[in-house]
Every structure is written in structure tokens, then in C-alpha cells.
Swiss-Prot record:
Its EC number is 2.4.2.1, 2.4.2.2. Belongs to the nucleoside phosphorylase PpnP family. CDD domains: cupin_PpnP-like. InterPro entries: Ppnp (IPR009664), RmlC-like_jellyroll (IPR014710), RmlC_Cupin_sf (IPR011051). It catalyses: a purine D-ribonucleoside + phosphate = a purine nucleobase + alpha-D-ribose 1-phosphate; adenosine + phosphate = alpha-D-ribose 1-phosphate + adenine; cytidine + phosphate = cytosine + alpha-D-ribose 1-phosphate; guanosine + phosphate = alpha-D-ribose 1-phosphate + guanine. Keywords: Glycosyltransferase, Transferase. This is Pyrimidine/purine nucleoside phosphorylase. It comes from the Bacteria. GO terms for cellular component: cytosol. GO terms for molecular function: guanosine phosphorylase activity; purine-nucleoside phosphorylase activity; thymidine phosphorylase activity; uridine phosphorylase activity. Gene3D superfamilies: Jelly Rolls. PANTHER family: PYRIMIDINE/PURINE NUCLEOSIDE PHOSPHORYLASE, PYRIMIDINE_PURINE NUCLEOSIDE PHOSPHORYLASE. The keyword Glycosyltransferase applies.
């Protein structure tokens, strides 16, 4: 099931803009202190580095991703999630707007 709405959170008003505007996100904080980000990646192939482990949840569009140390591109679409280890990196290839929630930790 795709997350369509997130209630009861605090939203950081200023956007995080990466890769010359190809990725734009906003941080959200839940009442228990849990942090996530919601955003969109526009058509591009990008490499992201992680500090903490991440789960990427697709809420619209599609992508292909490749985890560090692997050679295979894996498709991910609406309703799909993929996990990225902490202190790692992943490549993401997007041909249409990819809307996501990034779950940290």
C-alpha cells in the first residue's frame, strides 16, 4: 500500500535541493522525534551517500536503483520499498518524476 498522507508531523519549510534541482525534499519530524524526508527526484541518474540506513518508499512514479557493490539495476515503482545500508551509497536512475518517502534508521 502506498502512503498518500502523513498526519501530525512538523515539516521543515525550507527545501533541501540537491543535484542542481534534480532532487528536492523536505524534512519531517514525528511527535516521537522520528525523522523522515519526503521529496521528488526528476529525470536523471544520481548517486546518493548514506550515513544512517535508509528505506526508500516510492509513492509515485518509478526508478531503477543499484546498491553499492552490486552490478544489477533493480526496478522500483509505486508502493515498492528498498533498503540501503548505512555508510554506503546507491545510484538511482529516474525517467519520470519519482516521489518518495525516505525512512531513516
Amino acid at each position: 500500500m502506498t502512503t498518500e498522507k502523513i498526519d501530525g508531523v512538523s515539516v521543515t519549510a525550507r527545501a533541501n535541493v540537491y543535484f542542481d534541482g534534480k532532487c528536492v525534499s523536505h524534512g519531517i519530524t514525528f511527535p516521537d522525534g522520528t525523522k523522515k524526508s519526503v521529496g521528488v527526484i526528476l529525470p536523471a541518474t544520481l548517486t546518493f551517500n548514506t550515513g544512517a540506513p535508509e528505506i526508500m518508499e516510492c509513492v509515485g512514479g518509478a526508478c531503477e536503483y543499484k546498491l553499492d557493490g552490486t552490478d544489477a539495476w533493480v526496478k522500483s515503482g509505486e508502493g515498492d520499498k528498498f533498503s540501503v545500508p548505512g555508510n554506503s551509497k546507491f545510484e538511482i536512475r529516474v525517467t519520470e518524476a519519482y516521489h518518495y518517502i525516505c525512512h531513516f534508521g
